C-alpha cells in the first residue's frame, strides 16, 4: 500500500463531504455501475466531488484495502463509506440517499 496514495485518500475523504470514487467522470462514466451510481446521485441534486480511479492507478490499488471494500464505485459521505452501486441504488429507491446527502451538505453550509 503506497503511503502517498493513502495520505491522498485520507485528505480527499476528509475535505469532501460527499465523495464518489468511480470509473470515469459524472459526465462520462466508464462502467455501468459508475453510471447507475451517478444517476442516483444526480437525481438527488447535491453537489459532490469525484475521483476517476482509472486516471489514478495508485488510488485504485490502495483504496480497497483502506476502505475494506473491494469494488468501485465507492460513495463516501462525511468521512464514512456508504457503499457501492447496489447499496446506493437501494438507498436511492427508499429515499434514504436523498436524506443522507441533504444532511451531509447541510453540515458544511455556514
Model-predicted regions and their roles:
Residues 10-47:
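Local sequence-structure signature of Cys/Sec-based thiol-disulfide redox active-site neighborhoods
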Residues 65-71:
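Thiol/disulfide oxidoreductase modules built on the thioredoxin-like
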Residues 77-109:
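Non-catalytic, surface beta->alpha helical segment in thiol-disulfide oxidoreductase systems
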Amino acid at each position: 500500500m503506497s503511503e502517498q496514495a493513502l495520505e491522498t485518500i485520507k485528505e480527499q475523504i476528509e475535505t469532501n463531504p460527499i465523495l464518489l470514487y468511480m470509473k470515469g467522470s459524472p459526465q462520462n462514466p466508464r462502467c455501468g455501475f459508475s453510471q447507475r451510481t451517478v444517476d442516483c446521485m444526480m437525481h438527488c441534486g447535491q453537489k459532490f466531488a469525484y475521483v476517476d480511479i482509472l486516471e489514478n492507478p495508485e488510488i485504485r490499488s490502495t483504496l480497497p484495502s483502506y476502505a475494506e471494500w473491494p469494488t468501485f464505485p465507492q460513495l463516501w459521505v462525511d468521512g464514512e463509506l456508504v457503499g457501492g452501486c447496489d447499496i446506493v441504488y437501494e438507498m436511492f429507491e427508499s429515499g434514504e440517499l436523498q436524506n443522507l446527502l441533504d444532511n451531509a451538505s447541510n453540515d458544511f453550509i455556514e
